[in-house]
Amino acid sequence: MKSLILWSIKGYRRWISPLFPPSCRFQPTCSQYALEAVERFGVLRGSWLALKRLGRCHPFHPGGYDPVPHLCHHDLDNTP
């Protein structure tokens, strides 16, 4: 499942994204963020982080530097 999600994101970046002008308000781009989030946290948590990020990518949000977190909030609850 993870490889299918990653393949889909890479396919979007290669074949669909170039058809449109650059419009992502964030650095790294939303698709790069999604790749990193799924690779780091797996399909469920990574996809959730990517969807939350996509929800913030609109003209009324200032954007800027927004990297994938090193730990998920759930991971912080389990630290000793």
From Swiss-Prot:
- Fetch the Pfam families from UniProt: YidD
Cellular component (GO) terms are: plasma membrane
Q: Which InterPro entries match?
A: Membr_insert_effic_factor_YidD
What is this entry's stated membrane topology? Peripheral membrane protein
Is Signal set as a keyword in this record? no
Role: Could be involved in insertion of integral membrane proteins into the membrane.
Q: Which NCBIfam families match?
A: membrane protein insertion efficiency factor YidD
* Recorded family membership: Belongs to the UPF0161 family.
Q: What is this protein called?
A: Putative membrane protein insertion efficiency factor
Origin organism is Picosynechococcus sp. (strain ATCC 27264 / PCC 7002 / PR-6)
